[in-house]
């Protein structure tokens, strides 16, 4: 089963969208195998967004992610990375189609509510940044055969 990291960023937490957003992932059939509320340190945020370090928006990205609590989710399911990215929508909420998280709840590029890993390799690296191995719990839900088939 594939795993991916999802962050419900500080704007999602402040807007009290946690329950609504988590429900969208669960209703799609993804399984939560890890979940916690974190106030990201500057060090964690910089490691997480290291690929953007040379970009001009890097400082504001770090300031945003460290500016309030974030919900870190480890989700599991078939093609979890692609499924999450489709549910999230485009980075720019104003251009994201209705029916996606960003299309329904965001009009910003930076304050776009969620982060999702963009590849399986990055998902593994990001999950290791945000979760200890013993914080990820594998289990088979009673609806497994109905959702996965």
Protein language model features and the residues they cover:
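Non-catalytic terminal and connector segments of soluble metabolic enzymes
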Residues: 1-149
């Amino acid at each position: 089963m594939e795993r991916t990291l999802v962050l419900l960023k500080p704007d999602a937490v402040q807007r009290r969208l946690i329950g609504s957003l988590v429900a969208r992932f669960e209703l799609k059939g993804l399984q939560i195998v890890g979940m916690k509320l974190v106030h990201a340190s500057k060090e964690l945020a910089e490691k997480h967004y290291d690929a953007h370090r040379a970009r001009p928006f890097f400082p504001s990205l770090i300031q945003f992610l460290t500016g309030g609590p974030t919900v870190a989710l480890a989700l599991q399911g078939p093609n979890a990375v692609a499924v999450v990215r489709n549910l999230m929508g485009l980075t720019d909420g104003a251009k994201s189609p209705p029916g996606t998280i960003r299309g329904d709840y965001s009009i910003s590029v930076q304050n776009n509510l969620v982060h999702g890993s963009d590849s399986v390799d990055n998902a593994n690296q990001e999950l290791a940044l945000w979760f200890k191995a013993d914080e990820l719990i594998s289990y088979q839900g009673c609806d497994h055969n109905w959702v996965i088939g």
